[in-house]
Amino acid sequence: MFLGWATSSILHMNILVTNDDGFDNPGIWALAKAVRSLGEVTVVAPVDNQSGTGCSISFRKSVNVDQVTSKLDGVNCFAVNGTPADSVILGSKYIFKDDVDVVVSGINPGFNTSRNMFISGTFGAAIIASALGMRACAFSMDAMDHVNDFTVANVITAITNELMSPETPSGSLFNVNFPTISVSGINGAEGSAPARSDLKMNVDLQSDGGYEIFSGLKVNIDGLELTSGSDIEVLARGKVALTALDGTNLNYLRDDQSLHRMIDAANRVIG
């Protein structure tokens, strides 16, 4: 068992937990549970599914915030009838009164890799949090069957603990993807660059005469030949893929020191 995350220097920290799948999704409660020991945790998330909304904000629209029943003792929960970005803004400004230290978003059902991450409301929430000066990290995984996996929870705790470190600058931005978990478990954690790929946008005609738009990742080469060190290639090897990005221009940061601390902490948990 991995113990001893919280220290007296960070116990007072406020942690905002959000997602793009709605406040009732199991993934957000697995995430809240994983970080609950690290500080004062509050869930602020959309009322319903907001997948694919990216950094979208509800301008010129009244957005309601309602406190709802929490699924965890000691954790308050608020439902927002808006986007994940709205949830971060209203959570930090209205609920926390500009006193949020860290924002964690997820756990998203499905990878957020390559260019797909910029469509994701899960990662979009983290981008907005970073832009507002908060440290932020998005978490995603392929199959939600393992959302409550003990190792997954401890890796999230370890990464978030480093996110909260005074050594991690304000506005830092990270994206974390968990691999498909095999019988042998997770093979480790590694830094990764967003893979080079194209987006494949599909449009289906619906019975009511309207159209449904959905996306899928179109990888330019097959999984065995992916560029070494890309997020998709790291995941294909059964490892957790951690990506650091510059919150001001979203450039990939290969040598980010906080990223390397997170990788080391995750690998200590995984063993």
Where are these predicted regions, by residue range?
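Short beta-strand segments
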Residues: T18, V44-P46, N81, S105-N108, ...
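Short, Asp-centered acidic motifs that coordinate Mg2+ and/or phosphate
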Residues: V102
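Short, glycine-/small-residue-rich phosphate/pyrophosphate-handling segment
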Residues: C137-E162
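Glycine/threonine-rich flexible loop motifs
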Residues: F111-S120
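Electrostatically charged, flexible surface regions
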Residues: A153-G271
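Alpha-helix C-terminal capping segments
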Residues: G91-K97, A126-R135
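A cross-family phosphate/adenosyl-ligand binding-site feature
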Residues: I15, P26-D99
